[in-house]
Amino acid sequence: MEFSQYDDNNNLSLTKFESMLKTNNVLFFDSNEFENIIHHYLDNGKIALAKKAIKLGLEQHPTSTNLKLFRIEVHVFENKLDLADELLNALYEIEPSNEEVFIQKANIFSKQDNHEKAIQTLQKALELSEETSDLYSLIGMEYLFLDKFEEAKSSFMKCLETDNEDYSALYNIIYCFDFLEQNKEAIDYLNTYIDSNPYCQVAWHQIGKQYFSLKDYNKALTSFDFAIISDEVFIGAYLEKGKVLEKLSRYEEAIENYKITLALDDPTSFALLRIGKCYEK
């Protein structure tokens, strides 16, 4: 489902809805307003309010597919899987080409630990959808549940090809490489990614960690430097750079980097411990 960005009108709708709940008056909202209100409540974990909005929304707009899908989504969240499945089957009869029906169906299969069936269902959704990034991500997660790391990696790569700023997908790709102990392959992949995204601090940070695992400390150091150039308040890069400098016996420089992390955020026990170890050496 597509949702409009929250703006003044959305905030007014939310205020209007919450004011209505405090009175006995029932006000009219168009279906898009209900969708944004429900989306807001679900995003903020306010399930009871979301359910009230869904109930009233369907009373005012009984044929709204998106509101029906929200109702199903809440049933799945509450593990009312049989009821959700029954409602989905009824919706499928009306809209057999709606990819959201397949996504929610896959969600049910996943909750039932039937991950292979979830993948097959998500692949059907792929055939119907123009927006594929989130679907590839969902498929990747199902493969992770099955410990099929090569397949998961491939799915997350497709996700990143569709949206090259999806850092969650990038982290998942590296997780798969790490589990498969494919450090060199990970470096090759990250280098290709960096060619198109030269100022991506996440990629530089990850490539530095790969070099660190291979004990190529000089290349790791260069990578963390580039991560810091890309984002000079990236605490993780300073911590990793400090670890590399320790390996190179450059303890004073390591201390400097650990101290930077203390200035950027609340002190971590790791940074304080490493500073103490460096002073000992």
Residue ranges of predicted features:
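Register position in tetratricopeptide repeats
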Residues: 43, 77, 111, 145, ...
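Structural marker of alpha-solenoid helical repeat scaffolds
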Residues: 60, 93-95, 128-129, 162-163, ...
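Canonical positions in the second alpha-helix
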Residues: 57, 90-91, 124-125, 158-159, ...
